[in-house]
Amino acid sequence: MAVHRIMPRPRKNNPALRLHRRFRSHWLRNSRDIVVWLPPGYGLVRGRRHPVVYFQDGQNIFDPHTAFLGNAWHAGDRATELIRAHRIVAPVMVGVYNTGFNRMNEYAPTPAEFAGWDGEKCRSTGDAKRYAKFLVQELKPFIDSHYL
């Protein structure tokens, strides 16, 4: 039997993070958490537009508390360093949490068999086209209207 880990909420001690719990998708017929990182100085200059970077497996990008096996990518820390060094334009970063048991279905473009974590034989349904529609037609318009 496959084991699926439920991801905890990110810690609330980071004012740069905005969590959208159970963001609903019509295309995927499910919900997932979305975390948005706002760069230093966000909102200080009226009308300023920021580039947006979207990350899959979004529970991993900022907080070890929510990251798979506690290994966060620390994307906010790295972006802040690069912004302060004037090496990048300050982006808004969006972490799209995976749904655990549905992860491979959503990322795979075609049905396929693969070995699960415990060696169990698994099969993906190949829902990448629907996942792309979720990103482009549902999530991006939400991010654009709320953060840009």
Please give the residue ranges for each predicted region:
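Non-catalytic cap/lid and distal C-terminal segments of serine-dependent acyl enzymes
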Residues: A2-L148
